[in-house]
């Protein structure tokens, strides 16, 4: 059996990439599960803890994007860019369809089951901003998606430029 050896630098790089991906993702999942459970029991999602968790999620996602840029880690930025772009497109189509029930339209059912988790992680924050939760949720999703796309493109283009020098 062959042992896999990593240099210290390579181990640090892998650990940083894993941490930059796992930390915001775990905060997002925890917040979404709590918020969905909180709402399913009939409680008001604009109360303190759900809004606080939503703020924590947005801060963790933005901090993850900033740290990905600082440490030049492209994978977390690309991962979250793709996740939130898909979420933004799906949520925009869902809002444009005019349906008020996630499960009313068969086309969006599978996508919304998967992509509702990121949106629900900060939906109480959107609901606390205004009673029309669609617009703030779309804005938050768009900002997170575009910031990650920008970082991913910047890291990709700067990496190519350094390799061509």
Task: Give each language-model segment a name.
Residues 53-81:
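Canonical alpha-helical transmembrane segments
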Residues 24-32, 57, 61-64, 84-91, ...:
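Helical transmembrane-bundle signal
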Residues 1-58:
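Transmembrane alpha-helical insertion/packing segments
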């Amino acid at each position: 059996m062959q042992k896999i050896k990593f240099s210290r630098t390579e181990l640090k790089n892998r650990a940083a990439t894993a941490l930059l991906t796992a930390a915001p993702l775990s905060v997002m999942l925890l917040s979404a599960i709590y918020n969905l459970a909180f709402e399913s029991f009939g409680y008001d999602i604009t109360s303190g803890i759900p809004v606080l968790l939503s703020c924590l999620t947005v801060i963790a996602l933005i901090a993850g994007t900033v740290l990905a840029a600082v440490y030049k880690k492209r994978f977390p930025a690309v991962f979250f860019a793709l996740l939130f772009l898909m979420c933004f497109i799906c949520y925009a189509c869902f809002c444009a369809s005019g349906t008020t029930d996630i499960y009313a339209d068969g086309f969006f059912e599978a996508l919304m089951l998967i992509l509702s988790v990121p949106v629900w992680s900060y939906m109480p924050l959107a609901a606390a901003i205004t009673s029309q939760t669609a617009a703030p949720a779309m804005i938050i999703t768009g900002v997170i998606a575009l910031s990650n796309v920008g970082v991913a493109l910047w890291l990709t283009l700067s990496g190519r430029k350094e390799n061509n020098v």
